[in-house]
Amino acid sequence: MIEIENIEKKLKDTVGSDNWKKLSSDFVKAKKVYVIGNGGLYFTAAHGATDCTRLIPGKLVVSFDSCGYMTSCANDHGYENLFIRWLETSGDIDIVEDCMVIGLSCSGNSKNITRALSWAKSSGYATGMISGVQSKRLEKDINEVVLNCKYFHTCEILTLILFYQLVHEAGHTCPTIIEEIKRKDSWVLGKKK
């Protein structure tokens, strides 16, 4: 059986940490949150952003989903600047004080993530990183939530669970599967609830 490193204990330890409380507080205050990640955490970012936006009215949580922009930007500016360029472009219309950038990195050292968080911090965004292990590259004044994971899959699974914890800490709930089926059935039948 696959080892998931006592994920429930890791979740409790993480949610009880001061760094998590800071990240959660910044998340709750923000009206718009950018989530960035690579590899498996790229998809975790997309999944978490989608569900946070869907489950928290009045909050926009976005991840980077444009492959065309990604290849163009990486070609023109270098992969290490990919997320900085996206934030610069998107940030032109943001009220920075209402925004947050959350970086996801299993190693804590993804150059494009740490560079983007440094740029965001210096531009006035609230920032935070969720990492599998302590970063050796992240600037010290950026809040880092360290999951202390041995495996990539544990880090990715726990990070996704933490997005649902953010939904909860923002004062909302995640519907059960049965509740969601009933809600969708009522829409199909024209009985909006």
Where are these regions (language model features)?
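Cofactor-/ligand-binding subdomain signature composed of acidic, glycine-rich
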Residues: 1-14, 191-193
